[in-house]
Design a protein with these regions (language model features):
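Beta-strand-rich N-terminal accessory domains
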Residues: 2-81, 229-230, 234-250, 258, ...
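Extended, loop-rich substrate-binding clefts of extracytoplasmic carbohydrate-active enzymes
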Residues: 27-29, 100-152
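Asparagine-centered strand-capping/turn motif at beta-strand->loop junctions
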Residues: 46, 160-166, 306
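Extended, compositionally biased flexible segments
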Residues: 66-116, 128-129, 295
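Acidic/His-leaning functional-site neighborhoods
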Residues: 109, 215-289, 294
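Exposed beta-sheet edge/beta-hairpin loop segments within beta-rich domains
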Residues: 140-142, 150, 286-297
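Hydrophobic core residues within well-ordered beta-strands of beta-rich domains
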Residues: 146, 156-158, 298
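Active-site/ligand-binding surface loops and adjacent short beta/alpha elements
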Residues: 169-171, 175-253
């Protein structure tokens, strides 16, 4: 078993956490830095901008679990299209200031690697802390600490810990905006959301109750409220199911853009690349946003595992 996460602890950084036999620090032509991970259980890549897990594949899996656009833009200050972008401290548009970027700033801010360890089985735990900058202080006026623990092995586990360092409560929205790699969006289904109420963005935020498994034949963008259970992504083409387990989350978002919207993004290409992805997002959004009291910590956890179909 991998060691328990230390996301809620205050850690002193290791002298040089980058010096680990399973870890390699690389820099691309645009100056973005990544951690390439190759341990006995899995391979992965994490961008230090946004502490963004862009790739993860267990060594028992025939196909990558996460989808990464062939047309992703690797530029400072811009989110990478694919993997697991972090949405924080708001989800979607900012509630009062339309000039601020969608989904918050955590995914485009530099993070610091504090600590690296490995279990006896080879699974790795990496702990990151978001760097506070003048830009983060401009967008969020109260003090906080944001720490992400990433555990990489046969399963991918994420623990995002928000600590309120202010003298008053504050409210956050948050999500792991996870892009999953699928054989063909038209042939997969999602179970675990039956009987949940959702807000349908495609239909003007109409509220409905979900009946049955989710299948996809057009643009799909639904926010499932008051949901804290597992979801299963069933993919007969890849002969697998991906299980999404979570805690500290009362919202699940399911999104796939379909052709017109995908082509309009600018970083998903103009072909059919969009057919190979679906987002299933562990979140706290809309009326499920989280109130954090002074000196308290809220942890958002998601865990992904691959099972034979």
């Amino acid at each position: 078993m991998p060691p328990k996460p230390l996301a809620t602890e205050i850690l002193q950084p290791q002298a040089d956490p980058y010096q680990h036999p399973y870890l390699k620090l690389v820099t691309d032509e645009n100056g973005l830095r990544y951690l390439d991970i190759d341990n006995p259980k899995a391979t992965a890549r994490i961008a230090l901008q946004g502490a963004h897990v862009v790739q993860w594949q267990p060594k028992t899996a025939a196909q990558p679990v996460l989808w990464l656009s062939d047309h992703a833009r690797y530029v400072a200050g811009r989110s990478i299209r694919g993997g697991v972008p972090l949405c924080w401290p708001w989800f979607g548009a900012h509630p009062t200031d339309s000039t601020l970027c969608s989904h918050g700033f955590a995914r485009v801010i530099p993070w610091e690697l504090l600590h690296v360890s490995a279990s006896e089985t080879g699974a790795m735990r990496l702990i990151f802390q978001m760097q506070v900058t003048p830009e983060t202080e401009r967008q969020l006026s109260y003090p906080f600490r944001l720490v992400l623990t990433v555990t990489i092995g046969n399963r991918l586990k994420l623990d995002l810990a928000t600590t309120n360092l202010a003298h008053h409560p504050f409210v956050i929205g948050e999500a792991y905006h996870t892009y999953f790699n699928v054989s063909d969006i038209a042939n997969v289904s999602v179970t675990g959301l039956e009987d949940c109420m959702y807000s349908d963005k495609v239909m003007g935020y109409a509220r409905q109750i979900e009946h049955g498994a989710l299948c996809f034949e057009r643009e799909f963008d639904r926010v499932f409220l008051h949901h804290n259970g597992d979801c299963i992504l069933n993919d007969p083409g890849y002969q697998r199911r991906i299980r999404i387990s979570k805690s500290g989350s009362n919202t699940t978002v399911v999104w796939t853009p379909w052709a017109d919207k995908a082509h309009a993004t600018g970083d998903m290409g103009t072909g059919d690349e969009w057919r190979r992805m679906v987002c299933i997002e562990t979140a706290n959004a809309l009326e499920n946003m989280v109130v954090i009291n002074p000196n308290k910590t809220h942890v958002l956890t998601a865990e992904y595992s691959v099972e034979a179909l």
